[in-house]
Swiss-Prot record:
CDD domains: uS7_Bacteria. The keyword Nucleotidyltransferase does not apply. GO terms for molecular function: rRNA binding; structural constituent of ribosome; tRNA binding. This is Small ribosomal subunit protein uS7. One of the primary rRNA binding proteins, it binds directly to 16S rRNA where it nucleates assembly of the head domain of the 30S subunit. Is located at the subunit interface close to the decoding center, probably blocks exit of the E-site tRNA. Disulfide bonds: none annotated. One of its GO terms (biological process) is translation. The gene is rpsG.
């Protein structure tokens, strides 16, 4: 246990265009090598594409997508007497959103569209409709937790 005091978590500043804190955090996940302006251009471009394709509020689509991607349970490795068990544990709210954002960005980068805003928009639209690679990742994580339910008594 650390002897020092617990450092308070800093709140992210809301993004300049929509004034949304979650979107600002998402931009930080998209950002590579500290290039915030590039990340902003990518995210805002993707939201514009979503707006033209679906004729809906892009922030609504974004929040739906994150909700559909965020995992409720995950497995953690726990070593008990020489054997390693995959123990299902509930995911904290902060980690849920962080994982959802990370998976959304990762699977957007793997898509085949031309530009990053188009890839991100495609993954956002798919995720908001309950399909796409990021949603599949969540289902896989849930399936692993369900398969290892027998080891849930090995709590952390």
């Amino acid at each position: 246990m650390p002897r020092r005091r617990v450092v308070a978590k800093r709140e992210a500043l809301p993004d300049p265009k929509f004034g949304d804190v979650t979107l600002a955090k998402f931009m930080n996940h998209v950002m590579i090598s500290g290039k915030k302006s590039v990340a902003e251009r990518i995210v805002y471009g993707a939201l514009d594409v979503v707006k033209t394709k679906l004729n809906r509020d892009p922030l609504e689509v974004f929040s739906e997508a994150l909700e559909n991607i965020a995992p409720l349970v995950e497995v953690k490795s726990r070593r008990v007497g020489g054997a390693t068990y995959q123990v299902p544990v509930e995911v904290r709210a902060s980690r849920r959103s962080a994982l959802a954002m990370r998976w959304l960005v990762d699977y957007s980068r793997k898509r085949s569209e031309k530009s990053m805003p188009q890839r991100l928009a495609g993954e956002l639209i798919d995720a908001s409709q309950g399909k796409g690679a990021a949603v599949k990742k969540r289902e896989d994580v849930h399936r692993m937790a369900e398969a290892n339910k027998a080891f849930s008594h090995f709590r952390f």
